[in-house]
A protein has these predicted regions:
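Ankyrin-repeat boundary/"N-cap" motif
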Residues: 1-3, 27-48, 74-90, 113-120
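Ankyrin-repeat-protein effector appendages
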Residues: 2-5, 106
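Serine/threonine-rich, low-complexity intrinsically disordered segments
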Residues: 9, 52, 101, 117-120
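Ankyrin-repeat intra-repeat helix-capping/turn positions
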Residues: 10, 52-56, 95
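Ankyrin repeat domain, specifically the short helix-to-loop turn at the C-terminus of the second helix
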Residues: 16-25, 59-76, 101-113
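Long, mid-chain structured domain cores
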Residues: 87, 96-99
Length: 120
């Protein structure tokens, strides 16, 4: 998938041109939530958040989030309830506090502390 290729290779310019694939991915994982496919490695947001280059990760993350927020409107928070956990796992593993600070607002305190104790 072109989206994963852009994320893995840190191609921010390409990611910005893949809005339709970002939304397809967000829709897919949202619709599939709770069907046993909750492995965080299946989420693009995880692969963005775990990048070693924290500045690039934040730029890619903001591109991903802004695309979703613009297109999803009132449904954005419902989607973030599904996307936040795998994104937090990646951000905690990579120590990207900027992404952690944004994503932890979408999960309850117990879920956040579970991620920190498990992956930190």
């Amino acid at each position: 998938m072109e989206l994963q290729h852009a994320i893995i290779h840190g191609d921010l310019d390409r990611l910005r041109k893949l809005e339709h694939q970002i939304l397809e991915h967000a829709n897919h994982v949202y619709e599939d939530a709770g069907n046993g496919n909750d492995n965080y490695e299946n989420f693009s947001i995880y692969w963005i958040a775990i990048k070693e280059d924290k500045e690039l990760a934040l730029e890619m993350f903001m591109t991903f989030i802004n695309t979703c927020q613009t297109a999803l409107g009132n449904f954005f928070h419902a989607y973030m309830e599904v996307l936040a956990y795998p994104g937090l796992v990646g951000a905690v593993c990579s120590g990207n506090e900027a992404i952690v600070d944004i994503l932890k607002t979408f999960v309850d305190e117990d879920a956040y502390m579970d991620i920190v104790s498990t992956y930190n």
